[in-house]
Amino acid sequence: MTDGGQSAELRSFSGLLVLVGAGKMGGALLQGWLRLGLDPKNVAVLEPQPAPEISALAQRGLKLNPDPKSLAGVTAVVIAVKPQIAAQAVPALALLVAPSTVVVSIMAGRTLKFLATALDRPCALIRAMPNTPAAIGRGITVAVPRNASAAQRALADRLLAATGAVE
């Protein structure tokens, strides 16, 4: 279990994190990561209708809607899209995924099996379900791993802890 406090600090994260979908929950995660010290230069956001505060982060180095082909060495992908667009969105992410990549999904109603089939690549998968208070940093998220090492699970927990406790 990880709490939303200092144990989840992200200042030391030096990889590339791709957030797919920056609506209510994805945006809450992003704001939490930045609050915990994540450098915007380490983040790419794929969001067709970004909120003004997310667009403004591009001034601080956040990569907003880059060509996914230009993103090399992705450490983690967090999928926060609506489930109804998952069948289109998730397979397109396969080019970002390597065996060392951690893929975290907070999509409602989409299983680990769906993710594995849609990505069709070996990678660490984490299926997570945050509750509504996560949108204000006071949530509890249940996370279930598949093919994830202890270090990959720890990274996923650190990312998810930006909005509250993780089980």
Kindly give the residue locations of the regions a language model identified:
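Short, glycine/serine-rich, charged loops/turns that create anion-binding
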Residues: 24, 50, 110-111, 132, ...
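Structured catalytic cores of enzymes that bind and process phosphorylated ligands/cofactors
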Residues: 22, 92-93, 151
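Internal alpha-helical scaffold of NAD(P)-dependent oxidoreductase catalytic cores
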Residues: 114-124, 140-167
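NAD(P)+-binding Rossmann beta1-loop-alpha1 motif at the extreme N-terminus of oxidoreductases
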Residues: 2-68, 138, 165
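Rossmann-like NAD(P)(H) cofactor-binding subdomain of soluble oxidoreductases
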Residues: 29, 55, 60, 64, ...
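Short, conserved glycine- and acidic-residue-centered signature motifs
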Residues: 18, 108, 149
